[in-house]
């Protein structure tokens, strides 16, 4: 059945044209009460094509017939968004009265911004809904389509949104058909209507604080600043919840979050946010006072620093990512904060950052020991320093700064086996930034080991400073073996085998002297007797 009524057409053009201005991104000139409309085919089935983009330059990006008007100014397409079209009861587009009702919905506040607050039960004053039709998810180009739509008026709600979209599109009403009254359009009825709702996106970033600020050895902290730039929300759009969430590696102990700031100003725990810890998972969840500050500071940087103390090395790579879990709603007044979902679908997640560590074992041995497996020496004392050239290809024993400390101690002593194990020494991290004490993906880092005291009875070596090369991972860096030689001491009383040998030799010499003396005496006596006989 077809209707061809001039009054009907004018009301339709005026109502539908005005109604969809914000959704379609059309300028006010798009409405034309004297449109050259054609017949409405009430038996036809139409479609709604949704083009979903981030907010761009604020100018219209397309027309109801699908022609683009501002390709350069539109924001990036948004995939993964789903829309539902709810058929409105009580609006008959076959009558002038029906189009008058559509026209009334163009009045300010006629379509509440929170009409879709509960997608399962949308609300529209003075109207109910008959049935609904759901689009597929928007594709990589930001497009989705609802097909086979009868000639009706529909409330359209954004009913599924990716986690990185902080502000949904406002609900809107669309008619099938729609008068094609845009500039340079032909004024006919469009049964395949295109709309261009927009979103506000939010992102989250993570880095690693320069390790020089926190130490280079086991017991030092690794700190991960997590930040987001706050979007501008509509006046009657409010945060339902806003949370930073970070699950830290098991090799980090005493995990927590500190230094929560907004635009560089510190926020207060309890007053502005709640700190939660569940095992290795740490959350910073903003309360009503904090959410109000977030809404009131668009464009400002919100940051929290997650941290833990290094206890061991494992494979050498301590990886970390964080999530931002947030949502908004349209309301007349700020709603009470809701509890963020524990496992939301695809929340904004930071890129992975990595802090790399290695370990070091040294063994002090007796340099005079000629056995294959030398015994360790207890009581040798060492200090360890950063190397002046930390990332030299060949490490040198030139130290930089003060000795490294563990719990305030800078001198470490060999135990019963003659060993000291440094369970973790910093190698590098994945953050490239000018001025950091770091080289991304460095294969090793140089340290300097200094022996400050030899074990009792042993001599401190002349080369007490030794260059050490530490590689990422436990047990990767070869054990360092350091010799000590015994002290020189005065001669001892000779009571052993060597003394007996000397005594024997001395006795033999005395005996030879005695025998020689006897022989000489006898020779002289015989000579004297011969002389007397003569």
UniProtKB/Swiss-Prot annotation:
Residues 334-347 have a biased composition (Pro residues). Keywords: Cell wall, Fimbrium, Peptidoglycan-anchor, Secreted, Signal. Residues 1-32 form the signal peptide. Residues 496-534 form a propeptide. InterPro entries: Fim_isopep_form_D2_dom, FM1-like, GramPos_pilinD1_N, Ig-like_fold, LPXTG_anchor, Sgo0707-like_N2, SpaA_PFL_dom_1. Residues 361-376 have a biased composition (Basic and acidic residues). This is Fimbrial subunit type 2. It comes from Actinomyces naeslundii. The lineage of its organism: Bacteria, Bacillati, Actinomycetota, Actinomycetes, Actinomycetales.
């Amino acid at each position: 059945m077809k209707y061809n009524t001039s009054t009907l057409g004018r009301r339709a053009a005026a109502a539908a044209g005005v109604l969809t201005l914000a959704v379609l991104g059309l300028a006010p000139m798009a409405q034309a009460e004297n449109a050259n409309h054609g017949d409405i085919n009430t038996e036809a089935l139409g479609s709604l094509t949704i083009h979903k983009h981030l907010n761009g330059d604020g100018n219209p990006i397309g027309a109801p017939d699908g022609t683009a008007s501002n390709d350069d100014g539109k924001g990036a397409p948004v995939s993964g968004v789903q829309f539902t079209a709810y058929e409105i009861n009580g609006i008959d587009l076959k009558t002038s009265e029906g189009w008058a009702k559509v026209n009334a919905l163009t009045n300010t506040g006629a379509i509440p911004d929170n009409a879709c607050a509960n997608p399962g039960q949308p609300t529209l004053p003075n109207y109910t809904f008959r049935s609904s039709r759901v689009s597929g998810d928007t594709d990589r180009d930001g497009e989705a389509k609802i097909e086979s739509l009868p000639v009706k008026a529909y409330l359209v709600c954004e009913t599924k949104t990716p986690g990185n979209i902080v502000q949904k599109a406002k609900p809107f009403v669309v008619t099938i058909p729609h008068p094609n009254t845009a500039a340079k359009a032909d004024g006919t009825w469009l049964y395949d209507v295109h709309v261009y709702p927009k979103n506000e996106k939010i992102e989250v970033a993570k880095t690693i604080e320069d390790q020089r600020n926190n130490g280079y050895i086991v017991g030092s902290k690794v700190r991960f600043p997590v930040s987001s730039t706050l979007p501008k929300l509509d006046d009657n759009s409010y945060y339902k919840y806003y949370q930073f969430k970070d699950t830290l590696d098991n090799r980090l102990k005493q995990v927590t979050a500190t230094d929560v700031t907004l635009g560089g100003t510190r926020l207060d725990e309890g007053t502005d946010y709640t700190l939660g810890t569940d095992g290795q998972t740490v959350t910073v969840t903003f309360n009503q006072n904090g959410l109000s500050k977030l809404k009131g500071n668009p464009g400002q940087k919100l940051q929290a620093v997650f941290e833990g103390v290094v206890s061991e090395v494992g494979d050498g790579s301590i990886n970390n990512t964080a999530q931002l879990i947030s949502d908004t709603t349209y309301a007349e007044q700020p709603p009470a904060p809701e509890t963020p979902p524990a496992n939301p679908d695809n929340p904004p997640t930071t890129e992975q950052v990595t802090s790399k560590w290695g370990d070091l074992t040294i063994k002090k041995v007796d340099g005079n020991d000629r056995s294959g497996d030398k015994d360790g020496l207890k009581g040798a004392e060492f200090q360890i320093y950063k190397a002046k050239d930390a990332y030299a290809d060949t490490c040198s024993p030139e130290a930089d700064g003060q000795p490294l400390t563990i719990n305030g101690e800078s001198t470490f002593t060999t135990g019963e086996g003659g060993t000291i194990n440094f369970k973790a020494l910093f190698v590098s991290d994945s953050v490239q930034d000018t001025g950091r004490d770091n080289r991304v993906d460095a294969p090793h880092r140089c340290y300097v080991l200094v022996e400050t005291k030899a074990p009792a009875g042993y001599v401190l070596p002349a080369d007490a400073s030794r260059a050490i090369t530490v590689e990422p991972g436990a047990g990767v860096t070869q054990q360092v073996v350091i010799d000590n030689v015994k002290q020189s001491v005065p001669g001892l009383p000779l009571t052993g085998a060597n003394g007996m040998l000397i005594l024997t030799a001395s006795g033999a010499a005395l005996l030879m002297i005695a025998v020689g003396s006897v022989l000489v005496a006898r020779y002289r006596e015989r000579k004297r007797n011969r002389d007397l006989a003569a």
